[in-house]
Amino acid sequence: MTKADINAVIPAMAGIHPPNPVVAYIALGANLGNAVQTVQDAIHTINDLPQTQVTKQSSLYKTAAMESLPGSPKSPDYINAVIEISCHQPATLLLEQLQKIEQKADRIRPYLNAPRTQDLDILLYRDESGDAHIQTETLTVPHPRMWQRAFVLVPLAEIAPQLVSAERLEGLRGQGIERVYAAL
C-alpha cells in the first residue's frame, strides 16, 4: 500500500470529512414497484444530501434479474443506472446515507440477489490521489463484483469511459442489457 492509498483510506474509513470534494460513483437499481420512478427519485434524494451534488448521470438500462435461489420464480427485470457525485462525506457516512434511502423505499434483504425496491452501491470513491481502497465489515470499495456486471459497467462507461476498458465491456457481451431511457 502506498502513502497515497493510506491517505485515501484513513479519512474514508475513519469518518473524517475530506477537506476537498471526493468523487464517488454509485450504482442504482430497482425491480419492484415503479422501478424507473424509484431510481429517478433516488438520484434526486442523493443530490439533496448535505454537501453532495450529482455531477453525471447515465441513461437508465433494463437488465434481467440475477436469481440466487434455485427454483425461485422469475423476478421482474431491473432498471439500473450509475451516477457520479461530488461530496465531502467520508465513504462510511455516504454508505449510511444510501442505506437510509434504501430503507425509505422499503428495501428488505431476505437473501442474496432478492428482488428489491431500491439498491444503492458505492462503486468507487476517488480523491485527488486516486481510488480509495476501503475494506470494513459493511463496505468494500472498489465494489468487489462491479467488474463482472454489465448492468454496472455499461452505465459507468457511459459517464466515465476512462474507467472502463473496451476489453472489460467485451467480456460482458453475453449479459443482456438494454438502454431504455437516455440520461436526463
Regions found by a protein language model. Give the residues of each.
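Flexible, gly/pro- and Lys/Arg-enriched active-site loops
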Residues: 2-9, 66-79, 89-184
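Short N-terminal binding/cap micro-motifs at the start of the first secondary-structure element
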Residues: 34-36
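A structural signal for short, well-ordered beta-strand segments
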Residues: 28, 57, 81-83, 120-124
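Extreme N-terminal starter segment of soluble prokaryotic enzymes
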Residues: 21-25
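Short, surface-exposed acidic-centric catalytic microdomains
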Residues: 41-90
